[in-house]
Amino acid sequence: MTPSASPSPSPNPGDANVKVDADSPNDFILFSHELPSGDIQDLIRRLHRYGTLPGYPHLARFLQECALLLRTEIQKLPRALRDSVPPFHDVVTLASHWDRLKSGPLSGAWDGPFLCLYEIAMLIGHHETHQLSYRRPACLVGISVGLFSAAAVAVSKSISDLVSYGAESVRTAFAFCVHVQRVSQELEPTMTEQAASVSWATVVIGVPADTIQVELDRFNHLKESESPGANARPLTGVSISHVDQTSVGVTGPPSRLKQLFRQSELLRSSRHSALPISGGLCHVPNVYDDEDVRAILEMAEVWEKWGTRALQVPLISPFTGSPFLCPDAYHLIEAICTEALTKQLYFDKLAGGVVTQLNGLSCQVLHYGASLMSDTIIDDVTSQLSPCDTARQCLVDWALRDAFDQLPGGPTPPRDAKLAVVGMACRMPGGADTPDHFWELLMNGVDTHTTVPPDRFDLDAHFDPSGEKENTTTKGSQSNRPLSRQAEQTDPMQRLALVTAYEALEMAGFVPNRTPSSHLSRVGTYYGQASDDYREVNAGQKIGTYGIPGTERGFGNGRINYFFNFQGPSFNIDTACSSGLAAVQAACSALWAGEADTVVAGGLNVITSPDIYCMLSKGHFLSKTGQCKVWDIGADGYCRADGIGSVVIKRLDDALADNDVILACISAGATNHSAESISITQPHAAAQRENYRQVMDRAGVSPLDVSFVELHGTGTQVGDAVESESVLSFFAPLGRRSHPDKRLHLGAVKSNIGHGEAAAGIASLIKVLLMYRNNTIPRHIGIRTAMNPVVAQHLANRNAGILSENHPWLAATASKKRYAIVNSFGAHGGNTTLLLEDAPSQHSQRYKNHSRRVVASSEVVCTSAKSKASLRANIRALLAYLDTHQETDLRDLAYTTSARRMHHHIRIASSVTSTAQLRSFLQAAADDVDAYAKHIATATKRTAVFAFSGQGCLYHGAAAHLFEQAPLFRNQVLQLDRIVRRLGFPSILVTVAGDAASVYDSARCPHRESTPSSDASHDSNTNRTSTAPAVDSPLIAQLALVVIQIALVQYWGLLGIKPSVVIGHSLGEYAALVAASVLSVADALFLVGKRAELMLAVCEPGSHAMLSVRGASVDRIEELCRESEKRYPFEVSCVNGLTDLVVTGLRGDMASLRDLLQGSGLKCVLLDIPFAFHSKQMSPILEDFENAAQQITFQEPAVPVISPLLGKCISEANVINGKYLARATREPVDFVAALDSAWADGTVNDKSIWIDIGPHPVCTSFASNHYGKAATQSFASLRRGDETLSTLTATLAALHCLGLPVDWNEYYDLRENPARLLHLDSYQWNYKNYWIPYEGSWTLDKAHAGQNNKTKDDNSAVTPAFFTSSVQQIIFEEYDESMGRMEALSDLHHPDLQGAADGHKIHGRSVVTGSIWADITLTVGEYLYKQMVPGGKMPHMNVKGMEVLEAQVLHPDMSQFIQIEGVLDLPRQQTAVRLYAASANGTRNTDKPFASATVCYEEAQDWQDQWQMTSHLVAARANSFWEMAAGGSDDNARPAGKGGPRVNNFFRSIAYQLFANVVDYGARYRGMQRVALSEDTLEATADIVLDKDRHGTWHTPPHWIDSAFQLAGFVMNSFGVQGDGKISGSSRDFFYITPGWRHFRLLERLEPGPEATYRSFVRMFPVGSEPGAYSGDIYLHRGKRLVGVCAGIKFKAVPRALMPVLFPRIEPQAGKRRNQAQTAENRLVKGKGNCEYTHTVFQEPKSRTPAYDVTKSQPHAEHCDISISQKTQPVAAVPVTQPALPAKERGEQNQGQSQSQNAQATACLSLISDETGLDLDDLTGEAAFADLGVDSLMSLALSAKIRAELGIDVQSSIFLECPTVQDLVTWLSK
């Protein structure tokens, strides 16, 4: 609401200038503009601590209101900005993240609100500390943002007013700062830098303001002749922001400030320093206007919150030096925003303004501590008031005292917020697997009790009616049914807790991090559990891997938190029979205390143990006759029952804000104890009444207003009597409920389903929630014969009773709510009570009374699952819902299935316009799930390519429908239009939005009252309608296209889709550069507008034309022209495809050429464009355009830019500049070359997703035509003629199914067009049976078990554990305080280690490469350090002094073992590692090591400091090699230039063919993709991609190390260096081997695959002291970063004649290894699972990628498709379609697939299926093991089984190395 839309306050200038008389206070308050120096977090902590003390109630309330308002304002921000703010519930928590806030995308928005919070809080605390009455000062002074604090004081009459308006000033300051930062970032993005350190202002000392202004005018080019048609003062200009006696402040974009002080000799030589202003531009006349002020006022709701409040105290303007002349608070805030945005600060004027408001002989200055600016102003006031005495009072001193010696005034009372129950789920007896089924059971009066099922235990064996048999029960009834099964080692209670939690969250529409209350760090779990039957009886018989996490109580909650990634509290609570409701009450307390924002709570009970029956029977708890007979005369105890229930609860305000469906509200809750009962198990009426009183008093509700009480109602004589007394005496006292409408109804669900013990309370709560939903009270079936006379006596004359028939429960009205009580009492004496009430009436009516905008639009409906079976069932459930709810609104359904669902990795989605169309789609999908389902693989990453079309796709109103229907997009367009107009160009709104623009164009400049605060001289050139060109002018058209494209980029970003790569065609490249952060928004629009103006000024419209030609190449066109024997002068402007061209020339020539080509059967179109772009017509504007672009700042691309001008991908800075844009204007657009380059270098591939950014898809069609439709997946944003936005919704549906993270919550703007959350059917689980049955009757005689068992004496040795592939067995360890020592034994013929050696052959023999010794050294170094410093930060390791004295050559006919010794000297921070030849028993063959090295533990920063000087030099030298090698071939050297070295360029195959002259590398070692080598200088550089497979368990796989650093060996051995140091063409005389290196350092772990490309460089030098020896340093870069160095690597010459001697060839002979070797291998491989020690295995971190289909069960448990050990996280996408392959490649692929399906693979998959319970159908293709539930524990178990049963040597990391089924099958086939 704004003043123009509401009754405007009457201006009364006479009241605005508040006068003070002689008796008024003679003091003033100075509000600073900057936060105090020092620790802001400590200041806020101090304020928070004072706020907890009893003497500071106003301070406490102020801090609470600030937190609430900031949370509200943050929710208004786009998702990306919201997510950058950590969750907080109070300001101290928010302030604790200060460093994170100041480095995030809102870095500049926090100083302002925290300044206001600080200033107001200090002022309030000052009054409360000194117990001062609130006294208004004579006047106020504020500077910049400090004016908002001053405004709060200016309108406050009391300290209470100051609390309210102070909090509003914080809100307004936040809105102001957010707006300033957003606008400033559009002028120059600084978020890519360390934002907090970027300064937008500089102070210059000692130079007059007039002199500085002259310099600024010169710098800003303020000569109209230099900027024809453009704004005289560019948005990015530098201007003066403040002036005082000694200094002048200048402000502007950071890069422009740097240029200013570089170019201006005057300013460069002056005294100047940067100001700590990181938020953006303020006090500038050239950037903001009234629209900005209005936007801030609307965002902060200033009219609604400040309104017509009168000013109480004059506030001095720092611009005029006089009081603001404003009639009310609204206009005061408006004036402050205007001044803070657009007016300069004149501090010299402030003193005079203050003096005019003061009188008397003394005055007091209240200030916020010393600062240069404050001291200057106060000194000026003091000097002008002389001889008046001026006293100073610091408002901060009170908070800086360290003495918090005041005692708190008791505990802080619970917050009075009501809570909302928004979700529920259950598994109850009688088949009640859903709340709806549970309700049917209650309405039908079903008694569910039955005998104990045989799968629990043998009832005949454990039942003894006499009660005399030991460990038997006399009661055998149980009220349950076999529920669902799952993984047998996990307690069914834990499985069902997870299942029902999921279903309750699904009903609640919970999506992680969707809103503040759903932030994962603010969600907790609370469950009640009172027994461990399954652990004690069932799982204890078959203890396995999951024994502990599957059965210990804490894991029940922990598994839910882990699965969903909840980071809030997790409590498992046992209060006997009341555990479930006590857990709910504890969860409510957490919400009231602010410990969580959302809680999942419930109760768990699954009965499997006969022992508990026995105990309860012996204790006389159980009924001998069946079901609980609550209040029946024959009540004799209770019937035990299974039960699981979960509810989701939030604070009511959060639920309303989150658009949740509220089932009911919880007003209050309490738990107490019956301490005065005569027996611990006997209830106590007085304690129960006290419990009720606590609840009702806390809620402030009369007991007489309660209309229903759900009793605990166990059905015992004592319990029924006591509870009836306590309930009726409190809620229905005699004579008090006389009115018929006040009747109290009673009920007890135990009469239907029995006593669920720990689940009893949650069952009662769910029953009452269902009553609220269905407006009915179910009948009570507990009285089977007659009522208990004691109960009847209590009921008499109280207008209370029990219903024997279902009874309507009238829904709440505006004047009357329904209140209900839920009781639950524990046998241990605990009493828990909750008070429930109706959801707010305005909530239930909000949609009925809201008239939606009637817009025909498409909607996206989607569903997903963890398995195809569940997906099919989910689809059918959705169809069934549509059948039974034919009135369903399509938007509600779309909103529910997209924005309010957690999405799984098997998905379907469709864009539809009607429910009939949806029904058709769903039916087809249900009939053929395989055809419709899209599988999202966690292991595949997708690239999103944004393609920006050129001007030819624009048409009038191109984005009209999206503008009208999508507020997010509309807001972007309106903001961009404002920038266009501020740049001096005409509005583009009509061109973009068509007729819809008129509504918003008129709203942009509404009639506003003129007030004294308005400055008539404020320049504004935003309204140029009188001189604006026609809508279809080239200027408007070009600006409009770029505005649409930029707005689409921003819109897609808000929806969660951001580009990985961008490509722009012609004009579209400007928007592409904005998307890549090369250009700011303002700069891009300036350049586009400037270019268009130059065209209009210089070029003649219509003189030239552009002709689109399809179906012919350039050669064909030229051929046709020659054949015609006529001259058709043309030039090629665009190469869109091999036969899709645009040619240009004079219009007449193009018309003739068109006729010629059409006559030859070609399709030609003359484009309706006034200019011929990319032709010689553009030449006259190039120089002026390039000059205009020189003032623009070009940033380094944030994502690769595919350049159609250069035909390559650009990732580095300084390539795109003004010259580039000038060339792009004139030179042709070669889209084909750009596409080819992007594919060749891997920037795009067949998995890339192409999104066309423009009014109509053009560029994506170019890509599809060029690559082939099978190799591209392209989608459009808009399409001409699409009025329902079906193009956009279809794209959203497709992107969702491809796994891109669509933010559906942002897509739905509920403020403008609300949607309702529907309660659809819950997830359809794919149940499978898993259950460990209780065998026999061993519990009957367990006390005597084992008396006859003989004790076994097992002295067999335990085989040491397998450690890694290179350090296989640790056979000895010892440690003391400073030293650690270990010995390990490894078999060189172990498959992993032998495989590594086999990849490095010399003369046909496998030789252990030095990279294996490096891995061993790193492994030992890390292991010892972690053992000696457990939990400490692992430093980086430098492998120094590697010396290999003897090569290890593998012999196939003998065993070969090595012993590894490591000795850690902790004080010296180093580990000595020595390697010895050894026997199979670990004995060394010799005391002389064959290799040794030292690991030194060092700091990475020291390395980086050392490398800083050389890194860029090395990189530059390597780059120059590639430039010199350009144009060469594999076998032809190219001269590098005059006097330069000859450089040869080799690709992978040739390089390793040359290498094979000495070393024959296996495939895994062939990481060098290409090499550039100079024989002259022994230099080389190589581009490297590491093999994706680790091939074992390693610290750093040897084939990775070798690939990264083998370049030196290539230099020495590829051509050969002779013994005299000369180089020859081959290695015929010598070959070179390396004995080691000086040091080896890796800054980071190596990463495999094309995503991590490395570049190495080396230069080898002769070692003067060693003839035939060479040494060099190998440098390894990843991108621009130096990540590794192997320094001093040495190679020694060996005569080639010795090669057959050193490495004699041996023909392979099978089966020659001796028995000793076989025994040792068995010991090392087969004995891995039987380990005595536990060691950390060095391998990649275990993936925690989710699989939603968590295994969930109900008792007797079914297994559904949720993996219990996984958590939910986003997943990456896989391609929907695979690219077509040539026939030969298809044949090879099919052959490979055929070979992979061998018996070994089949057996392995069958074993995995057996062990996991997965169907073989699930183990196909791209199915990811992580998604299927294979976690770290399961990986260990499966790998052990595969080794033991199939004899396949696999490590537990196999499922990380082969993340999908296809990966594993491929690996097995190898």
Swiss-Prot record:
Domain Ketosynthase family 3 (KS3): 416-838
Keyword Phosphoprotein: yes
Domain annotation Carrier: ranges: 1795-1870
Cofactor(s) essential for the protein: pantetheine 4'-phosphate
PKS/mFAS DH domain span: 1368-1700
Keywords on record: Acyltransferase, Multifunctional enzyme, Phosphopantetheine, Phosphoprotein, Transferase
Spans annotated as Malonyl-CoA:ACP transacylase (MAT) domain: 947-1282
Positions of the catalytic residues: 577, 712, 755, 1400, 1602
Protein name, entry field: Non-reducing polyketide synthase pkgA
Species of origin: Emericella nidulans (strain FGSC A4 / ATCC 38163 / CBS 112.46 / NRRL 194 / M139)
Phylogenetic lineage: Eukaryota, Fungi, Dikarya, Ascomycota, Pezizomycotina
